[in-house]
Amino acid sequence: MTRSALQMGRLTLVLCLLLQLVLVTQACFLGNCLNDGERDVDGREAMRPCKYCSFGQCVGPQICCGDRGCEMGSEEANKCREEDEDSTPCQVFGWPCTLNNPGNTNGKCVANCIGICCVTDTCVVSSECQKESKSGIRVGCQRS
């Protein structure tokens, strides 16, 4: 074999390996696939609403929040552990808020009347969640 034929063979081998690498990385991994094994073309996971608890929605495995506040570790809040059994992630309703929580700073405002911002493992009172309408009444709260 000539020297140029060897170089062409190596170049072809390198190109084939690069193509194979690209095809393998396009595979369906656990974190970016829907239940039927198809890759989500937008790169987003399918979402469903989080389960409801006695007076609001499940925010984490042991956190139930609604307009009257949040319960953590109570019997009712422990029903939220069922969320962990479902492989499809759920979406907590509420506008975004920021927590000073290492590794998980993107929370949701879940108790508008009180102004509580939660992530899956903790909640804090946040002025960011006490949004008011133009009339000065907190959004989602009833006048008493």
From Swiss-Prot:
Disulfide bonds: 28-33, 50-90, 53-64, 58-80, 65-70, 97-117, 109-129, 118-123
Propeptide: 37-44, 131-144
Any single Pfam family the record assigns to this protein: Hormone_5
Entry-annotated residues carrying Aspartic acid 1-amide: 36
SMART domains (UniProt xref): NH (SM00003)
Tissue spec. comment: Expressed by the venom duct.
Keywords, ordered alphabetically: Amidation, Disulfide bond, Secreted, Signal, Toxin
Leader sequence segment: 1-27
Domain of life the protein comes from: Eukaryota
One Gene Ontology term of the molecular function aspect: toxin activity
Subcellular location: Secreted
GO cellular component: extracellular space; secretory granule
Record's comment describing the protein's domains: The cysteine framework is C-C.
Family under the similarity heading: Belongs to the vasopressin/oxytocin family.
Protein name: Conopressin-conophysin
